[in-house]
């Protein structure tokens, strides 16, 4: 999973091998929904986000707890969560296997800790 995330941060390349085109990475990691569509994209984990071809994309960091514009990723039904932050060149991954889980609260706390550790 880490190699997949790094490949996306590298614009579709893993080492010297091209896995996805730059265009494909841009399609899945940049917002493509309209402001009107975004009004229905209002789950707790998606406040401030739009949606790309496959992933949520942070478009309004002022209304979420922490993150950089352009952060993208996805989460799963059993509580797994992944995001890439191209601005800071970092990946955040959280893996659990609990249907329903604890929701977004522990993720927000962990992301706040991660971002507070970054040097300006």
Identify the role of each PLM range.
Residues 1-120:
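Catalytic loop of the DD-peptidase/beta-lactamase superfamily, centered on the K-T-G motif
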